[in-house]
């Protein structure tokens, strides 16, 4: 491999030149990549075209052909969609792969474009009980295996229900890797809470002075769907509670009905194909374009369960909160929403989980509230005393609302648990100020107010609410947040002023922009530094004979293996860049640091973020150091990925 330093070309936007109408043309055909045959009647869309460009969406003809005419010079993309197929794009060489840009010169006419689209796959099988009898109307779900923050995860996919033979069929699967599951969550809630919830739904909110608005109070705790599921399926009464087995994360779907025998409730716990109680032990199926996998059967078995009861208290006493139980060791499915059991505490803080099988669990309790519009909720700073103005250099503002949380491990055996104490604590806030360092004029107050921040968990877990995970800037560019759960976070800035990019996030003299910020107490002194000198990395990819390689994808990742995991959902230092049709690539705004670069066939890049893959690629990659605000270029040769 070679790595040459030089100037980086700049991307061009579509524009008209000269006096006449533009005459550029893009023409091609939609194909099935398995056999190369044309696919007729797909919808084809042109991206990057100016608003005046005629017909940016066309329908391919019966031979799969399409054409866009009257185009100015510029950079374009082409995508294709058709029922029964995964979306395709020019330059996409694998399902869900990166598209490729097309650089069109003034008056240039390109007529050899091929757009692949892949047929959906399907999975079918039968769900039976312990006696081999079919289970009817039961939710079955596909979960796609992905790499998130450097670790394998299962992402929720389509849900179907079994027919009167217990047979299911999950269509419309993008080719890839999947687990198949019959999810089952034992959801319960106090009748007093359900009655109040239903009454308020009919009267559009709290109906008496001082009465709690259940929907408002629980909307940021994930409990509204739980109450709706219990109402929808008319749950079984157990004491002063209503209880239902529901297909977790599947609106309107149900799990097999529980039974009561020997004084204990028996339920069908979540089960993965072929006979796995957890996602970590599930079989992973690989489905290819157009393939239908059959006999993916799942047999369920009843499990005896126990009740888990106790009291929730917050800093000011007993309160109503949402509680969940998840298996303690099943990290692969930690974000699928497949809780073993959920419940709510009543106004006195009392709660009961119903239908909990034996095992070890993590109990999580949450109560989060965010003001609908500004003003005085818990945690908001008080106004200055009457007759006094605010200080000229006010402290970092604090957003209203609050987040109370608890998490603890519990072991459930054959006997009920009756006296569990759950003590909620307040979450933590992130605050700080911003500095704009560069030759450009300082951004105006109304501009910096339009910035926002995202607090990205290092392990990419879902936050209790996306709203709580957002931060705001005031007119002085001071950052404030809602209360967050403890953990490790990256601070990502959205919509910075034009010409400025985030350079660093410093806390106590340490740059935490590229390492997760541990949040175990309020942070008030974060300094976000913006620069008007963004870095740029560009170059050329060649094949084995020295010609340009348009089939390559360039990967950029840190030299330090510590940066290959726990980098959140929006990593700054890992990039996959699809080269253009001339084998050229470019990316901007990489933080300064030491990187590895490698070009590989795009077909081989599906799981490139797996640390095991990166470890292999690191031995073949080119090392490069990128300084703050530096422009570098590199010439790479495509490397085959070792099996």
Predicted regions and their residues:
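Long luminal/extracellular ectodomains of secretory-pathway precursor proteins
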Residues: 1-643
């Amino acid at each position: 491999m070679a790595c040459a330093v030089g100037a980086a070309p700049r991307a061009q936007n579509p524009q008209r030149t000269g006096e006449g109408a533009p005459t550029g043309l893009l023409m091609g055909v939609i194909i099935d990549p398995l056999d190369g045959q044309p696919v007729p009647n797909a919808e084809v869309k042109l991206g990057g075209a100016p608003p005046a460009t005629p017909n940016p969406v066309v329908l391919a003809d019966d031979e799969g052909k399409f054409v866009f005419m009257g185009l100015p010079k510029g950079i374009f993309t082409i995508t294709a969609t058709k029922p029964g197929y995964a979306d395709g794009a020019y330059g996409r060489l694998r399902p869900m792969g990166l598209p490729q840009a097309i650089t069109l010169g003034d008056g240039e006419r390109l007529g050899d474009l091929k757009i692949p689209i892949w047929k959906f796959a399907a999975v079918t099988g039968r769900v039976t009980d312990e006696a081999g009898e079919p289970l009817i109307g039961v939710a079955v779900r596909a979960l796609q295996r992905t790499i998130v923050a450097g670790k394998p995860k299962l992402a929720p996919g389509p849900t179907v229900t079994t027919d009167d033979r217990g047979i299911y069929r999950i269509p419309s699967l993008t080719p890839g890797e999947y687990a198949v599951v019959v999810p089952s969550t034992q959801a319960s809630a106090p009748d007093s809470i359900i009655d109040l919830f239903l009454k308020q739904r009919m009267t559009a909110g709290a109906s008496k002075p001082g009465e709690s608005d259940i929907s408002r109070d629980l909307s940021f705790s994930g409990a509204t769907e739980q109450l709706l599921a219990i109402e929808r399926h008319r749950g079984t009464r157990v004491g002063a509670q209503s209880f239902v087995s529901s297909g977790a994360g599947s609106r309107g779907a149900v799990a097999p009905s529980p039974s009561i025998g020997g004084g204990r409730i028996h339920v069908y716990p979540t089960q993965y194909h072929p006979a796995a109680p957890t996602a970590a032990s599930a079989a992973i199926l690989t489905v290819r374009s157009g393939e239908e996998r059959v006999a993916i059967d799942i047999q369920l078995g009843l499990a005896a369960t126990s009740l888990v009861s106790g009291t929730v208290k917050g800093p000011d006493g007993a309160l109503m909160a949402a509680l969940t139980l998840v298996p303690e060791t099943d990290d692969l499915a930690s974000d699928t929403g497949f809780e073993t059991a959920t419940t709510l505490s009543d106004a006195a803080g009392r709660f009961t989980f119903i239908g909990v099988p034996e095992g070890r669990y993590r109990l999580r309790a949450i109560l989060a509230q965010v003001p609908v519009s500004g003003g005085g909720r818990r945690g908001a700073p008080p106004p200055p005393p009457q007759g006094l103005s605010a200080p000229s250099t006010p402290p970092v503002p604090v957003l209203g609302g609050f987040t109370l949380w608890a998490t603890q491990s519990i072991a459930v055996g054959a006997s009920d648990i009756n006296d569990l104490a759950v003590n909620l604590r307040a979450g933590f806030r992130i605050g700080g100020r911003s500095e704009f360092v560069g030759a450009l004029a300082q951004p105006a107050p109304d501009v910096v107010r339009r910035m926002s921040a995202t607090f990205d968990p290092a392990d990419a877990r879902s936050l209790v609410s996306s709203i709580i995970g957002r931060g705001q800037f005031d007119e002085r560019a001071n950052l404030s947040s809602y209360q967050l759960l403890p953990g490790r976070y990256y601070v990502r800035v959205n919509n910075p002023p034009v010409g400025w990019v985030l350079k660093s996030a410093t806390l106590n003299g340490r740059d935490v922009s590229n390492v997760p910020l541990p949040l175990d107490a309020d942070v008030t002194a974060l300094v976000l530094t913006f620069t008007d000198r963004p870095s740029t990395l560009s170059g050329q990819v060649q094949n084995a004979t020295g010609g340009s390689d348009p089939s390559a994808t360039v990967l950029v990742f840190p030299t330090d293996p510590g940066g290959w995991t726990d980098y959140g959902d929006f990593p700054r230092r890992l990039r996959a860049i699809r080269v253009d049709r001339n084998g050229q690539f470019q990316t901007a705004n990489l933080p300064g640091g030491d990187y590895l670069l490698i070009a590989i066939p795009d077909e081989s890049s599906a799981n490139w973020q797996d640390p095991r893959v990166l470890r292999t690629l690191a031995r073949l990659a080119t090392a490069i150091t990128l300084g703050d605000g530096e422009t570098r270029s590199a010439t790479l040769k495509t490397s085959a990925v070792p099996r």
